[in-house]
């Protein structure tokens, strides 16, 4: 894989209704931009039940599925796509683990979260998940296609 292709890896992030209500969107975007990732898609919406169920389809048989769908559809979500080298893995590290109380200080959930059911942000857990989630939340024309990364970031 060429370096250019690696630098163009994309991930899906969504600031959940609790993070939006608490005014954390700007802080979260700033963290990813300061890391060197490029914001290539951004929108705010209240997800439909169908979108939420499709997004969390892997959890359909889990006991928390109904509550998760209800929560994510309870208010505005800020959906984002970031691009950059290793962005999927880096974004997950920056988010922290699912339970905010177990997340390291310095991570988004470690710094701002207090409850596993209100953990502020979703991030894709693999390149494959990112591709699926991006396609679910964004139309191709809603994403920037020609992004020139800062030349000081990569060799």
Curated annotation (Swiss-Prot):
Molecular function in Gene Ontology: ATP binding; metal ion binding; nucleoside diphosphate kinase activity
Residues reported to bind ATP: 16, 64, 92, 98, 109, 119
Protein name: Nucleoside diphosphate kinase, cytosolic
Record bears the keyword Kinase: yes
Pfam family, one: NDK
CDD domains for this protein: NDPk_I (cd04413)
Species the sequence originates in: Dictyostelium discoideum
GO cellular component, one term: ribosome
Cofactor(s), by name: Mg(2+)
Enzyme Commission identifier(s): 2.7.4.6
Catalytic residues in the record: 122 (pros-phosphohistidine intermediate)
